[in-house]
Amino acid sequence: MTTPTAELGPLDGPLADALADLAARQAVGRLWNHDHTLWSPEPTEIVDRLGWLDVLDDMAAERGRIDDFVARLKRDGFTHCVVMGMGGSSLFPEVIARTFPTGRSGLDLQVVDSTDPAAVARALAAVPEDTTLFLASSKSGGTIETRSHLDFFWDQIGRPEQFAVVTDPGSDLGRLARERGFREVFENRADIGGRYSALSFFGMVPAALNGTDWFGLVERAREVVPSLRSADPAVNPGLWLGALLAAAVGARRDKLTLVLDPRVEAFGLWVEQLVAESTGKAGTGVVPVVDEPIGPADVYGPDRLV
């Protein structure tokens, strides 16, 4: 990999300083070693949120199970899937549904993340009740919106073979699914936060259900890992981009405008949450801007990074 091309102007100096600081702190190695002191001396809500760094091998080991799950659904005549979730449990499935057409081996995928009763009713009316899988996705298992969706669809359908869940080990949702005899319970590793769960069961099961080459996504991500472990910003695009965002915030450019190819514009929804929810915790953050009409350079204020 090579360093991205960028016109940084006044940010050249701050970027160099940010990269030097990260090098001095050995940030890349400490990140991959799950060293919470990179952020804070207090490990709470850090050490139990870094599992995304190691999830790719886990998912590769689950290939047979996921593919068999989808194949059995197709063999049993299923045609549609409704994913129930909020936030990180629904955004990446939404990206998948809006970016990739339903594959020949997949189901017609739609995501329900609205609390509007009319919207939920429309979602049910849009699918054939007898050949639709209802997938409830909640890390905690207690997300009130998702549990409400599940209660509604269960009351309407009531057949356990048409329900499955993705959740963390030991959650109430997992226990409920087993008590009712749901078709499948996918238990994610618990040390992955919702917004970082795209390449875990939370993202890859819906991708597989859509007929997307989910394992290809995992394999391509694995190919990038050696670059992301490098301390050289010319090799590691994640290091370079992270340093650039930090340099921009230091220069009071704290609005990140995302300009995306129309074919992947839905990806901005996931990036928006990832950036917005991952920063700002200590009074300093980045405000992502998505779906904004593109204008000439002079319409963007001095607080923008485009």
Spans of features found by a protein language model:
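Extended, charge-enriched "interface" segments that sit outside catalytic cores
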Residues: 1-75
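Short helix-loop-beta junction
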Residues: 96-107, 155-156, 274-285
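Alpha-helix capping and helix-loop boundary segments enriched in small/acidic/polar residues
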Residues: 111-118, 122-123, 137-144, 148, ...
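Short glycine-rich or small-residue beta-strand-to-loop segments that form or flank ligand, phosphate
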Residues: 54-56, 80-85, 133-140, 164, ...
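Gly/Ser/Thr-rich loops at beta-strand to alpha-helix junctions
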Residues: 82, 86-93, 139-146, 169-172, ...
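Glycine-rich oxoanion-binding loops at beta->alpha junctions
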Residues: 51-68, 93-137, 142-144, 290-297
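Glycine-rich phosphate/diphosphate-binding loops that line cofactor/substrate pockets in enzymes
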Residues: 65-79, 122-132, 244-253, 300
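Active-site phosphate/pyrophosphate-binding segments
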Residues: 159-306
